[in-house]
């Protein structure tokens, strides 16, 4: 996969040289290029922003530097239409499913906005050259797109074949199956009056798997009850359904629903 990031603060992306993403770059599993938007300006001050039409606070990023930068990036892959991801609180919400989807692409381009955002005409113009997807990390506002890009590139990059040493790690972690991950423990088994759950010391792998599954249900119901209704009840075993019933959930029309008047553990 090739990833291009355009930013006025290219040094902000330095963490992508570290850890698994950095190693993936060194091993040739991921080609990642960071471009300074200011190199695509034409004035001596390297200006990338101007006042907004219609008035209002703040500045808006000028369209021409962005067009020049994006044309340069798009030219790297002829006869293709890369995905252009624009981090924005007005975009679709980034989640694990979207990370998996984007990990299948050959090239991703990230446009890191600043100030009050990028001139909207850039987004309109880019539709002819890219598959444009404004994407949001969540319902909050950041100073710029770089932090969001760091998170998205790591979430996407670690899904590429060979990046994570043990592929099973990807299957068992939070959100891979719509649930939060079960709690994990290591040695010593007794620590400061807190013991590891006995089932994990039993050596009974079937019961351990069931315990972990039920802990996923419990943790998700407590911390992210919004995820529960998105589960496909068709894949639930009888033991799963009983565990969910104990947490206050019934299966209605193939989906989980909190029992009317019942108490879920959240």
From Swiss-Prot:
Entry coiled-coil feature ranges: none
Record-listed S-adenosyl-L-methionine binding positions: 113, 137-142
Keywords (A to Z) from UniProt: Cytoplasm, Methyltransferase, S-adenosyl-L-methionine, Transferase, tRNA processing
SUPFAM superfamilies registered for this protein in UniProt: alpha/beta knot
One of the record's GO molecular function terms: tRNA (guanine(37)-N1)-methyltransferase activity
Gene3D superfamilies named among the record's database cross-references: 3.40.1280.10, tRNA(m1g37)methyltransferase, domain 2
Any single GO BP term: tRNA N1-guanine methylation
Location of this chain's protein in the cell: Cytoplasm
InterPro entries for this protein: Alpha/beta_knot_MTases (IPR029028), tRNA_m1G_MeTrfase_C_sf (IPR023148), tRNA_m1G_MeTrfase_TrmD (IPR002649), tRNA_m1G_MTases_N (IPR029026), tRNA_MeTrfase_TRMD/TRM10 (IPR016009)
GO cellular component: cytosol
First-level EC class: transferase
Reactions catalysed: guanosine(37) in tRNA + S-adenosyl-L-methionine = N(1)-methylguanosine(37) in tRNA + S-adenosyl-L-homocysteine + H(+)
Function noted in UniProt: Specifically methylates guanosine-37 in various tRNAs.
Subunit composition and interactions: Homodimer.
Membership in a protein family: Belongs to the RNA methyltransferase TrmD family.
PANTHER family (alphabetical): TRNA (GUANINE-N(1)-)-METHYLTRANSFERASE
Record's protein name: tRNA (guanine-N(1)-)-methyltransferase
Lineage: Bacteria, Bacillati, Actinomycetota, Actinomycetes, Micrococcales
């Amino acid at each position: 996969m090739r990833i291009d990031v355009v930013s006025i603060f290219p040094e902000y992306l330095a963490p992508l040289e570290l850890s698994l993403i950095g190693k993936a770059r060194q091993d040739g599993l991921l080609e990642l290029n960071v471009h300074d938007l200011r190199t695509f300006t034409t004035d001596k001050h390297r200006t990338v922003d101007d006042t907004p039409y219609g008035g209002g606070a703040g500045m808006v990023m000028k369209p021409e530097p962005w067009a020049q930068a994006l044309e340069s990036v798009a030219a790297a892959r002829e006869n293709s239409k890369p995905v252009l991801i624009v981090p924005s609180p007005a975009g679709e919400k980034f989640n694990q499913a979207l990370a998996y989807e984007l990990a299948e692409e050959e090239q991703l381009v990230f446009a890191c906005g600043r100030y009050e955002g990028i001139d909207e005409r850039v987004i309109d113009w880019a539709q002819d050259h890219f598959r444009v997807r404004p994407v949001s990390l969540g319902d909050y506002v950041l100073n710029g797109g770089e932090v969001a890009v760091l998170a998205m590139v790591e979430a996407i990059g670690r899904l590429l074949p060979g990046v994570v040493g043990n592929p099973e790690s990807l299957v068992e972690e939070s959100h891979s199956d719509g649930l939060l991950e079960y709690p994990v423990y290591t040695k010593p088994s007794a620590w400061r009056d807190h013991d590891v759950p006995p089932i994990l010391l039993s050596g009974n792998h079937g019961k351990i798997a069931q315990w972990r599954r039920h802990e996923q249900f419990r943790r998700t119901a407590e911390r992210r009850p919004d995820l529960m209704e998105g589960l496909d009840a068709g894949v639930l075993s009888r033991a799963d359904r009983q565990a969910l019933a104990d947490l206050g959930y019934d299966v209605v029309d193939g989906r989980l629903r909190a029992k009317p008047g019942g108490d879920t553990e959240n």
